[in-house]
């Protein structure tokens, strides 16, 4: 066999071994039993808790406690922040 072909076989074997080691692991997450079976009742309870926890998602300022402000000044501030890099010109990158 040519050296290039043997390197490809070694690489393929290494990839297969790594895939097998990842596939055989038990990945633990919330509500996953050691047997690999999920408890569906607890999953639905957690989704309900997540939805109840954030009731004011429509207005993010009320959740954070900041004062409501019109959208136009906020847009201009964001545009100025994002556009400030563009006004300077092209950046010079060192090689």
Curated annotation (Swiss-Prot):
Residues 1-25 form the signal peptide. The modification Pyrrolidone carboxylic acid is found at residue 26. It comes from the Eukaryota. The keyword Secreted applies. The modification Glycine amide is found at residue 35. It is found in: Secreted. Keywords: Amidation, Cleavage on pair of basic residues, Hormone, Pyrrolidone carboxylic acid, Secreted, Signal. One of its GO terms (molecular function) is hormone activity. InterPro entries: GnRH, Gonadoliberin. One of its GO terms (cellular component) is extracellular space. Stimulates the secretion of gonadotropins. Belongs to the GnRH family. This is Progonadoliberin-1. It comes from Sparus aurata. The lineage of its organism: Eukaryota, Metazoa, Chordata, Craniata, Vertebrata. The gene is gnrh1.
